[in-house]
Amino acid sequence: MLEKLIERVLFATRWLLAPLCIAMSLVLVVLGYAFMKELWHMLSHLDTISETDLVLSALGLVDLLFMAGLVLMVLLASYESFVSKLDKVDASEITWLKHTDFNALKLKVSLSIVAISAIFLLKRYMSLEDVLSSIPKDTPLSHNPIFWQVVINLVFVCSALLAAVTNNIAFSQNKAH
């Protein structure tokens, strides 16, 4: 009897995630606001904006879009996996969610982080002259911020590759059984 009560209480705690999911949807509102603000800035300066600044603005918009997609993916998958099934929604609209298990979600999150990091690096590359001009010429490589950003991006890439390989090995072993 005590065991069943404990199990019921533990299972009911999943609903504590629901307010967090709702709060996380506010992050989408903030990202949407930042996206529209950047888009408005780009459009309002269309006559005077340089090609480099236009590309940087576009990369910023892509970055915000990727981030919003990542938040939405984690939000929906978390709710679906841990709180309750999304049964009031047209199933054709969220078919990817039905086929997304925890390992697939980890892989998608890893790949999204790599993409966001790569966009950040590309934005830095577009302003490379400004960055390099602010660093003294005799600065060691370990003190160069671009060096560390590339290293961090490579860590993200290696982590995503390792997650993909691990997922593939685990999936092939489960398939064999």
Swiss-Prot record:
Give the superkingdom in one word: Bacteria
Q: Which UniProt keywords apply?
A: Cell membrane, Membrane, Transmembrane, Transmembrane helix
Main location group: membrane
- List membrane-spanning regions: 15-35, 54-74, 102-122, 145-165
Q: Does the keyword Methyltransferase apply?
A: no
Question: A Pfam family name for this chain?
Answer: UPF0114
Q: How does it sit in the membrane?
A: Multi-pass membrane protein
Q: Does the keyword Flavoprotein apply?
A: no
**What subcellular compartments does it reside in?**
Cell membrane
Instruction: State any GO CC term.
Output: plasma membrane
Q: Which family does it belong to?
A: Belongs to the UPF0114 family.
**Which protein are we looking at?**
UPF0114 protein HPP12_0190
Q: Which organism is it from?
A: Helicobacter pylori (strain P12)
